[in-house]
């Protein structure tokens, strides 16, 4: 669904003085903690006790859909609807809202409604979607906080499809709005839109990125580097869609289904005729961009991508027109009126076969994009397309399910899906969980089980590491991972290097024995899941470490986690959650391409941590000695498994001088300044808490003589927070 005018990333300065340099400008390699600040503040005008899920449940969804359906054919003079129907515009808006999602870190996607903010609102691929959102504004104002922009944009896409004759698979609300861009997202290394510096030598897009070009949702619709090469385009399509967890069948269904509707706009060259994007537009345009320099930006003069024309003879009806046109006719490349490469039919039969979008006396000829021809030229995609052509019902079902997946992929498990149109069928990509068909343990059983766990042969550090391994897979970006489900015991997690598989097998075996013995002993229907037992064991161990330091703490525990099975788990998809760096366990892979401390902060953001919470967490874990392979790296204490502030006291000690270790770029030796003897060993992750100015300021608080009790309580609070991040059933 590409519409891509040329643009750069510069904004109009209006003759004002240059922007003052930030610290990041002065010191580009300085560790940027700004992404954690997002987790420490509320920037929107929303009350502290506002519950969006509760408000959405009060919404009359049918009334909203009725208003949307009326809007579809209520063409506005300031932005007339193609063919008298806004449906294709709203499909593109919804697609481009959701289509930024990538599996690598779970960021992007429809959550937050971040298409409203830079840079996404000004990407060339999103040209004129500002108009779509303005068309929706009266409906958003009418229903207020009962429906978020994030939910409304996806709902508008669904209603658009339904209003043109297709039955969607379902719709779920529950996406809360953000009020700023997500500063944690790495959109790529380029300095200008529609450029690409993200491919390595074998042609693979850099790890973590989704799109192949800066400022585009997926790929260049003209073909790679603007060359009309369908075979090369197919490779880019497959790679980019794979990075949002779409296989060939889903990809083909989405493209074919989406391109069944509407047209692209290229009445003239966008580079010569369009004004600046919203972020660079003058203030009087009030956030609207891409104005036609010749004065007419709408109707038949509309310019978006520079590619011009419809795909089918019935652009506002669901039919087989796209697939039939693509497969049954031959196509040849040509430069369209906007100067971009597109494909024209060789057959006279298709010429002038489509009504004009605005002038009833005119006719247009269907066109195809290079990315469309790719579905015909690539043998695997073609096989799928031919199957769809022979089986229209299969095509429809595949499009319906792929559209549902596209627009809901970042919402997390099924219990977060709200509203009357949520399908009964749970999808494997939702990481579903079984229901608990037993009574949950109470306070008496919790105390009994904690005592039994601590009386076992398992150490404090083993229990802490296991609970952390289970819970820390959580990603707040797409709500995947976490301790619920106990997927730590399943493939692939049980064999991840960071989880020390042999030791993990021992720990889980002991916990499973305790679980079996407890469950078999109960005749009252009370049972405990392994998922709960893993977290309970970690809590008990942290409480023991605090007791070893003289502090009596009790970590709140709410049972209710369940154990998922292989049938609930798409094992390959969980590899995206495997950490290359787990700073909390001081695990660093040798082949990482970014400084370990950057990955530490990135992971902390996915856990929704602040800089202070991260600091307390690291200090506490080091004092406990909960390191990968039980190394002494960063364990600046003579009393491991004791929750103290020794890590900070010794990190800040000026009697220690640090130097890089000879055997690893990630390791350092702490030498006694007087004797030269090695006192400690550490990683970059440890030393960043004394090097970075902000982290050092926090460390100095925790390293004070009166701060140990504060550290213990802050660590316990942060630990408890992480253990419950995926407990959506408690919300």
Curated annotation (Swiss-Prot):
Binds 1 heme b (iron(II)-protoporphyrin IX) group per subunit. It catalyses: H2O2 + AH2 = A + 2 H2O; 2 H2O2 = O2 + 2 H2O. Residues 1-26 are annotated as: Disordered. The record marks 92 as: Transition state stabilizer. Heme b binds at residue 259. GO terms for biological process: cellular response to hydrogen peroxide; hydrogen peroxide catabolic process. It comes from the Archaea. Its cofactor is heme b. Keywords: Heme, Hydrogen peroxide, Iron, Metal-binding, Oxidoreductase, Peroxidase. Homodimer. Bifunctional enzyme with both catalase and broad-spectrum peroxidase activity. Belongs to the peroxidase family. Peroxidase/catalase subfamily. This is Catalase-peroxidase 2. It comes from Haloarcula marismortui (strain ATCC 43049 / DSM 3752 / JCM 8966 / VKM B-1809). The lineage of its organism: Archaea, Methanobacteriati, Methanobacteriota, Stenosarchaea group, Halobacteria. The gene is katG2.
């Amino acid at each position: 669904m590409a519409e891509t005018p040329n643009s750069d990333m510069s904004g109009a300065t209006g003759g004002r003085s240059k922007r003052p340099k930030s610290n990041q400008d002065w010191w580009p390699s300085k560790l940027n903690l700004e992404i954690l600040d997002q987790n420490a503040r509320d920037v929107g005008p929303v009350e502290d006790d506002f519950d969006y899920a509760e408000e959405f449940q009060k919404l009359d969804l049918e009334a909203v859909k009725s208003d949307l359906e009326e809007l579809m054919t209520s063409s506005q003079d300031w932005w007339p609807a193609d063919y008298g129907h806004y449906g294709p515009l709203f499909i593109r808006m919804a697609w481009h809202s959701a289509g930024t999602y990538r599996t690598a870190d779970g960021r992007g996607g429809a959550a937050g409604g971040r298409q409203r903010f830079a840079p996404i609102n000004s990407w060339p691929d999103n040209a004129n979607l500002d108009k779509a959102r303005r068309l929706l504004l009266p409906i958003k104002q009418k229903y207020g906080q009962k429906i978020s922009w994030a939910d409304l944009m996806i709902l508008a896409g669904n209603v658009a499809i339904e209003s043109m004759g297709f039955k969607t698979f379902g719709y779920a609300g529950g996406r809360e709005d953000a009020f700023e861009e997500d500063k944690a997202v790495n959109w790529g290394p380029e300095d200008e839109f529609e450029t690409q510096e993200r491919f390595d030598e074998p042609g693979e897009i850099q790890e973590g990125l989704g799109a192949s070009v800066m400022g585009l949702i997926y790929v260049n619709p003209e073909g790679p580097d603007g060359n009309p090469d369908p075979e090369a385009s197919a490779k880019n399509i497959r790679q980019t869609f794979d990075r949002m967890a779409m296989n060939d069948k889903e990809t083909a269904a989405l493209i074919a289904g989406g391109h069944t509707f509407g047209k692209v706009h290229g009445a003239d060259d966008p580079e010569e005729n369009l004004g600046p994007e919203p972020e660079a537009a003058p203030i009087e345009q009030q956030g609207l961009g891409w104005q036609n320099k010749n004065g007419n930006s709408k109707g038949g003069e509309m310019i978006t991508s520079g590619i011009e024309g419809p795909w089918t003879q019935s652009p506002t009806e669901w039919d087989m027109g796209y697939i039939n046109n693509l497969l049954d006719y031959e196509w040849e490349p040509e430069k369209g009126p906007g100067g971009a490469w597109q494909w024209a039919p060789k057959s006279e039969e298709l010429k002038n076969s489509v009504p004009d979008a605005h002038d009833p006396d005119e006719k247009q000829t269907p066109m195809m994009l290079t990315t469309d021809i790719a579905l015909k030229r690539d043998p695997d995609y073609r096989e799928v397309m031919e199957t769809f052509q022979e089986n229209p019902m299969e095509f429809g079902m595949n499009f319906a399910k792929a559209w549902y997946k596209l627009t809901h992929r970042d919402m997390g498990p099924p219990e977060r899906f709200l509203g009357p149109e949520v399908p009964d069928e749970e999808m494997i990509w939702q990481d579903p969980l079984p229901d608990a068909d037993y009574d949950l343990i109470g306070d008496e059983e919790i105390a009994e089980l904690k005592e039994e766990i601590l009386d076992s042969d398992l150490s404090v550090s083993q229990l802490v590491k296991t609970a952390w391994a289970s819970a820390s897979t959580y990603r707040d970006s797409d709500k995947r991972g976490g301790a619920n489900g106990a997927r730590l015991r399943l493939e692939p997690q049980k064999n991840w290097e960071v989880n020390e598989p042999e030791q993990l097998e021992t720990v889980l075996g002991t916990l499973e024995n305790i679980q079996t013995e407890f469950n078999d002993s109960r005749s009252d229907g009370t049972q405990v899941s392994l998922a709960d037992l893993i977290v309970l064991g970690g809590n008990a161990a942290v409480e023991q470490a605090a007791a070893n330091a003289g502090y009596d703490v009790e970590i709140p525990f709410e049972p209710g986690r369940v154990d998922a099975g292989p049938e609930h788990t798409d094992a390959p998809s969980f590899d995206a959650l495997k950490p290359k760096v787990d700073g909390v366990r001081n695990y660093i892979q040798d082949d990482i391409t970014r400084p370990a401390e950057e990955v530490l902060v990135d992971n902390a953001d996915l856990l929704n941590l602040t800089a202070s919470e991260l600091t307390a967490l690291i200090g506490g874990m080091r004092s406990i000695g909960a390191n990968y392979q039980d190394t002494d790296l960063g364990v600046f204490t003579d009393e491991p498994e004791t929750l103290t502030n020794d890590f900070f006291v010794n990190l800040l000690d000026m009697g220690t001088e640090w130097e890089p270790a000879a055997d690893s770029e990630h390791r350092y030796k702490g030498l006694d300044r007087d004797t030269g003897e090695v006192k400690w060993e550490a990683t970059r992750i440890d030393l960043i808490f004394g090097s970075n100015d902000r982290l050092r300021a926090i460390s100095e608080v925790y390293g004070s003589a009166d701060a140990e009790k504060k550290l213990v309580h802050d660590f316990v609070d942060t630990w408890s927070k992480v253990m419950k991040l995926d407990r959506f059933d408690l919300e």
